[in-house]
Amino acid sequence: MIQVENLSKSFGSKRAVDDVSFSVERGEILGFLGPNGAGKSTTMRMITGYLPPTAGVVKVGGHDVAEKPIEAKRLIGYLPESAPLYTDMTVEGFLGFCAEVRGLGGADKAKAIDRAIEMCFLKSVRHQSVDTLSKGYRHRTGFAQAIIHDPDILVMDEPTDGLDPNQKHEVRSLIRRMGQSKAIIFSTHILEEVEAACTRAIIIDQGKIVANGTPNELKDKSELANTYLVSINGTEAATVREKLGSVIESAKVTIVNDKPPAVLARVFPKDAGSDGALGQAIFSVAKQNEWNVNEIKKEQGRLDDVFRNITLSDTQTR
């Protein structure tokens, strides 16, 4: 549904987006991650036709955005960052205006307004003036205009920015529901949103794609993936390190906490395929030494760890 090929954008001598390529299919929810200034918003503006690229091609539903902008934009619902609204209109009036711009009229227009209001939980403010809405309701109204014409593709720039936890949960749930039948891309710097809503994620840094995969595939890149945390009462940290290190061949053992009452050790697998055997070996060592074990827990990788490792060098050079 969305094909981005060798996309670049320069502002003067600054290369904001540098040779970016990726695709998003129907049924996919792509999270576009990156630090501030990485090129997320610029890329999304080029996808929607709001900003022309310096080089490269964007195709939406098979239509080149530069050559057939009207055909491409018919398929897109766009929620820009800080979505502009006509504050002198009511919510219903604004959505009606957006529906007409999208070519809807009569019964189709009325159905589209009702549907968007219901999906975005706007019923209680339907007849309220936009300028009296809270930030959360304004954001929902912006979301509603993006889906008013039931587009096949949704492009959203920071869709939960500024919302409270309950509102964020509502928006993520809505994205997941719509993602079953649409191609969705949304930018964020909130890592928990990727795990909560996305089927795939891209990390962009200094205008370049530096990682691309499912949330689990990205977490597997973490140095903590498939490690084990072992919590033990009444045993010296040095003893724990020695026993685990000597019995579990070349697996690395680090002490996370050596203060009473519990020693906390992290045990790293020798290789990616040894984590199952590693868990069994840890249990055997604990049993043989009659340790008072609080917990043996296998750790999943952490997106924040992967994100930090990938983007840290750029942060240090800014």
Segments from the language model and where they lie:
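ABC transporter nucleotide-binding domains
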Residues: 2-4, 9-205, 210-211
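Hydrophobic/anchoring residues in structured secondary elements
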Residues: 9, 127, 253-258, 298
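Short loop or secondary-structure boundary microenvironments that flank
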Residues: 62, 69, 234, 271, ...
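Non-catalytic alpha-helical coupling and interface elements of nucleotide-dependent molecular machines
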Residues: 100-103, 223, 312-316
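A short linear hydrophobic-aromatic micro-motif
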Residues: 121, 169, 249-255, 292-296
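ABC transporter nucleotide-binding domain
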Residues: 172-270
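C-terminal coupling/interaction segments
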Residues: 270-318
